[in-house]
Swiss-Prot record:
Belongs to the influenza viruses type B glycoprotein NB family. InterPro entries: InfluenzaB_glycoprotein_NB. Residues 1-18 are virion surface. Pfam families: NB. Residues 41-99 are intravirion. The gene is NB. It comes from Influenza B virus (strain B/Leningrad/179/1986). One of its GO terms (molecular function) is channel activity. This is Glycoprotein NB.
């Protein structure tokens, strides 16, 4: 059984540089979008309303909330991880199951 040998002297440097440039552009684009998202969130922080958990009253964002919804919806504040219902179809959080 022969061991596989790799010869790295035949690697095309142009394709390696091209791949590195593409990865750098993608990462830079993601970072720029993230920065612009935070800037937009800072500018719109004082104008949005958020609904408290279990209450339908409108409260002003205090600045401590990680996400602030601008729409007038009845969803809870975006402070945790949302679990879609199709991932855990048998989970019922409101009732306990008997032994």
């Amino acid at each position: 059984m022969n061991n596989a040998t790799f010869n790295y002297t035949n690697v095309n440097p142009i394709s390696h540089i091209r791949g590195s440039v593409i990865i750098t552009i993608c990462v830079s684009f993601t970072v720029i979008l993230t920065v612009f998202g935070y800037i937009a969130k800072i500018f719109t922080k004082n104008n949005c309303t958020n609904n408290d958990i279990g209450l339908r009253e409108r409260i002003k964002c205090s600045g401590c909330e990680p996400f602030c919804n601008k729409r007038d919806d009845i969803s809870s504040p975006r402070t945790g991880v949302d679990i879609p219902s199709f991932i855990l179809p048998g989970l019922n959080l409101s009732e306990s199951t008997p032994n």
